[in-house]
Structures are given as C-alpha cells and as structure tokens.
C-alpha cells in the first residue's frame, strides 16, 4: 500500500524551510490573539492595541486625547465652565451658565433659543424663508427724473446737492469765529471780548481786592503774621511759645521731669506709691490670714467664686436672673404665670371653662374655569391649554392642574426641551400679566352653586397664596407626570416629570407658582402632550 504524502504549502522553500515561526514547546503555553502573544521567541507578553499602551514601569495604561481625563481610575469627559453631566451621564449646558449671551433677534427662554421674525419672513418647518411680494407694475418717469440701466436719477444744478439721500440747497459755509444760527450769521467771542452796539470791544478785567491777612503795598502782595507765626525764606512757619514749668515739674535742657516726694517713686516710667496703707474690713467682709471672704446669710450663697441667690424648688437661674420653672399647661405672659389654653377653652372670672366651637372655615377656590381656552404661552405663542384650581381648606391649599398642548406642542418627543408655565400674583392674590399664564386669560373665584368664574377680586383670594413665612425661599415638589395615560392604558415610558416651584419671585410679584416640565428623555417615542391630573399641596397665606 502506498502512503499518502501530506500536501506542501505553495510558498514552501525546500532549500531553506525555516521561515515560518514554530510554536514554543516550552511552558508557558498560550493561545495567540486572545490577550497574550509572544513578543520574542519564548517570551510571553500581553497583546494590546491602541488606545492601550505601557507606562515607563511596564504597567498597562490608557492613552487619552483632548476632552478626556482619568479621574480616580475612571475615564471621564474633561468638561469646562458652563458644562455639566446629568444623571444619565450626558454632557449638558449648566442651567445657570452665563457662558452664552443672546442679542435681538435671538432670545433665550429657559433652555430654548428662539428667533424673532418680522414682516417678509416666516418659519417653514424649522427653516427661515423670505416672503417676496408680487412685482409692482413698471414705472414711467418724466423730467426732471431720468431712468438709465434700471437706475433712476435726478440731474442737479450747481446750487443743489444730495445729503444723506435728501435733496437740498448747497449751504453757505462759515469758518470760526463766524457761525450760522437759523437764518443769521453771528460772531463767536471768547473771554475778554464782547459785542456792543454791533461793534467788537475788549472787556476790561475787574479790579483785584485783597482781604486780611493779605496786604497790598504798591505792586506787591504780602501776608500779615501774628504771634506764633513768622515768614522765613519765603515760607510761613510756626514759632514755639515760651513755656514755663511749675513744681513738681521741672525742665532740664529739652527734657521735662517730675519731682517725687515720700511715698512715691517712678518705676517703669510710671508714678507709683512705695508704701501700702493698712486695710480694715467691715462685716460681711472677713479677713482670714491673707484671704478675704464674704459671709453670706439666708437666701444667699457663694458659688464658683460669685455671690448668688439660693433658689428652692420651682425657681432657677436663667441668664443671670431668677425665673420660675413651669410645667405643662402653664406659660409666661406680661411677667405673670398663666394657664396655657387650647382650642375650646377660655378663662372667665379666674376659672378655666369650655367655650362653644367657632363656625367652620369656608373654603375658597380660584380657578381657570372647567374648560379653559389656550391660555398659556411659550416664547410668546399661545400653545398650552391649562386647567388650574387652587382650593384653600383649613390651613392648606390644594392644587389641581392638567395641561394639553396645541399647535407645535400638541405632541412632544424625547428630545423636547424643558419649559415652564408661571403664574405671578400681587400682594392681594390677584393674577398679574407678567407670567406666561397671566391675567389676560379667564381667572377668578368659583362659586359654590355653579361652574362660572367670578373675576371680581376679593380679599379672600390672598388665602390661596403660598405662605411667605413658610416659603421665604423658593421650595419645590417633583412628581411623575403621565402623558395621554387613558389612550395608552398606562403603558410604560409614557411619563415625564413635573416640578411645582413655590415663590421663586421675580420682578414686582409677591407670590409665584411655576409648573416646570422636564426629563422628556424618559419617553420612548413622540407622545401627545396631554397630562394626567396633577395634585400638590402647600401651606396657605394668612388673611
């Protein structure tokens, strides 16, 4: 039987068949192209490719380019001022960033940049388009107008000229000091000159007078000086007075010293007594060897080196004064201890008795009406139909609201920018015209018996406003907001977030409520902007 010979490769060299590398038969064994390689025959190495490389110490490291940085072992985007990362790790522009400014006709509201357009321009599917008017009929020109090559011209004589596109007579020019005012030519004169009876004359300067201590003699002015002053080398200087010293002071050269007698001495440039008088102590002071103590009687005691009043049960020291210790049901008022009374109790003839309950609080509701028109604007365009009601019951205000988009906001996509609807109120609780949901829409009080809107203001409207002491700084409530939930039967990925911001004041407003819609990237696809009914509560304002 003939043995089959294995086929040789096409590039086999029978003279020198040693070109192809042979796998190492010595450990360690490895599988090429799976993280390990043989950097030189018999040497095991890690198989890496860019952006991986080796450091000077032989460790594997990651090479980073512009815009990337390694921080605490993690690869991050190297972002500068005005940029930040959101919860999804996306790079976004900071909300309060001042990195970009916009000038008219560009305007920025919230996170949206818009372009104001005037006549002759329109927005067609996001593209700015020019509306060209119909061409006018051809014009005919008669003298002195002439038309040549599509240009209309007006021949001018020597005395005529065109200035800034206006036809006029060439004016006569005048050089200073001559000037033309209205239809007159006048002469401008400076200090020392005047025009009198149509003639130019010089004005004589007034005579100079001098008051003491200045003195004029012939053509010179001098200064009179008194005691303590003198003029030396043309300068005014003070001359020292002749001072005399009486005992115990005496003057030696330029030094003044004090003479001391018995019982006094000068130590460290200070006058001190050299002997101590004998001290005697009267009651309640007692001298014991070199110590002086205070004898305290009833009601007094020495504590911590201080004389204090000894207090019994029911009394204590508070901020250096004696105060009574009171328990539950008592309070201090007008320097007297009184009973602390709750609801339904009062004091009559020195005794506590129950009182009849007060009549219940009548709720107040402010609203837009049951079926409002498109009453909220974004970028100056009415596009949101907003139903909002504020109901004050007891100390809390309940907010019920729902919103439906119209026009360009009839549906929203995951890339929709955040936007806000703002209600601004004055100090009386009346809706102002400065928000994008303002007093130009239907707004007022709801009667108990029907669904109308009473627009006549009332002093009770203030009760529906956020309490300014409770919300002295802006406060917010964030809640999930489903979109078109009934049509989609509560399907997932059909909700965004709505934030109610309380008293984020601006301008002349006293109270504000801001409905801010955000996190549209939670949507899976384009969705009709028709929110579920949103409910919030906050503490109401005092009457």
From Swiss-Prot:
Stretch list, region Disordered: 1-36
GO cellular component labels: host cell nucleus; viral capsid
Key word Hydrolase present: no
Gene3D superfamilies membership: 6.20.10.20, Adenovirus pIV-related, attachment domain, reovirus attachment protein sigma1, domain 1
Keywords from the UniProt entry: Capsid protein, Host nucleus, Host-virus interaction, Late protein, Viral attachment to host adhesion receptor, Viral attachment to host cell, Virion, Virus entry into host cell
Record carries keyword Acyltransferase: no
SUPFAM superfamilies (alphabetical): Fibre shaft of virus attachment proteins (SSF51225), Virus attachment protein globular domain (SSF49835)
Induction or repression: Expressed in the late phase of the viral replicative cycle.
Compartmental location: Virion; Host nucleus
Major localisation: virion
GO process annotations (BP): adhesion receptor-mediated virion attachment to host cell; cell adhesion; symbiont entry into host cell
Domain notes: The tail region anchors the fiber to penton base capsomers, whereas the shaft, built from several repeated motifs, allows the knob to protrude from the virion.
Extra remark beyond the main annotation: All late proteins expressed from the major late promoter are produced by alternative splicing and alternative polyadenylation of the same gene giving rise to non-overlapping ORFs. A leader sequence is present in the N-terminus of all these mRNAs and is recognized by the viral shutoff protein to provide expression although conventional translation via ribosome scanning from the cap has been shut off in the host cell.
Quaternary context: Homotrimer. Interacts (via N-terminal tail region) with pentons.
Described function: Forms spikes that protrude from each vertex of the icosahedral capsid. Interacts with host receptor to provide virion initial attachment to target cell. Fiber proteins are shed during virus entry, when virus is still at the cell surface.
Family membership noted in the UniProt record: Belongs to the adenoviridae fiber family.
Protein name, as recorded: Fiber protein
